[in-house]
Amino acid sequence: MRPEPDKDWSKFWWLEPDVTFLNHGAFGACPKPVLEVQQQFRLRLEQQPLRFLAQDLEGLLDSVRQVLAEFVGADPLDLVFVSNATTGINTVLRSLHFTPDDELLTTNHEYNACRNALDFVAARSGAQVVVAEIPLPIQSPQQVIEAVVAKISPKTRLALLDHVTSQTGLVMPIQALVRELSQRGIDTLIDGAHAPGTIPLSLPTIGATYYTGNCHKWLCAPKGAAFLYVQRDRQAQIRPLTISHGANSPRTDRSRFRLEFDWPGTYDPSAYLSVPTAIEFLGGLLPGGWPELMARNRAKALAARKVLCEALNVSPPCPDEMIAALAVVPLPDGSYQALQTSLLNQYGIEVPIVPWPGGQKRLVRVAAQIYNTVSQYEYLAQALVKLLAAEAG
């Protein structure tokens, strides 16, 4: 699909008009109508806190869970809310018990925060972290599968894998990876931070033991909205990071899984409660709904990559099939901090320059949301050409 013609979708967001914002992938950005709904929930909470939290909230969360479950193709009984995908990863890792005989498998593309969580539980238990080295540039998703499978051993207990890598923007062949691991009796924990809203999801089809994803990134919900999916037969093992009233609730009409996660103590649930509005709003912007939005954003990311590669005279570091709404382009070696700062201060461009310690020392990572335009990527390309020329002297 061709990227859509430039159109002022940005009017629905509060983004600063004098900044060329090409970093939706960092924290997302919430549209004005969704923020208005969030504020309505906050007002309801403050008008009658007891009624809202003690009586209304449970039913409201169940309604949200139903909408979200339909979007990710899951049973609502298998979903709970967490504040972000990093929390989801920590929740699972710190609920499980490992031994010095266990190996925890991940890749060199794993998100730093989640890798830190993996290292933490490994250090605490004596387990070993094993890293599969996935090359960049990469020619095929098959290379990912081969790299991961090569690191499997009889000691491999769990694999922590990104669905879409954060630093490098690669769509991993996650269903094939889960299949390879599951066939060997290895549990899988998938960091889907960037997947909801960029890739059509059916969590049971993917087959991961555990899957967590953000709603505040590509679904454009308010900050602090994410979910954790746990296969039914593993839910008794997974406990929230905060143990509260649900731990000894006498209720039998709801699973312990829901009772514990739905009430972590007093909190503001408005971000979770706004998720259906975000899904409806984004899905209503184009005639083809979410499928068209995801396809257009992907086409826009590919167009952005083409613009940058041609301007910088470099080759794309991965095949088109491994792109969703993020794309990276290699840059000459140099300071990533200085270049990112110069882009913002001199050109008003907010875009991450990623330090990549493999085959490419620096990458520029662009995001493609509906409010972005191809002309913005052309402007970025022009700025990079000038700044890189200045670096080279």
Residue ranges and their predicted role:
Residues 1-393:
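Pyridoxal 5′-phosphate
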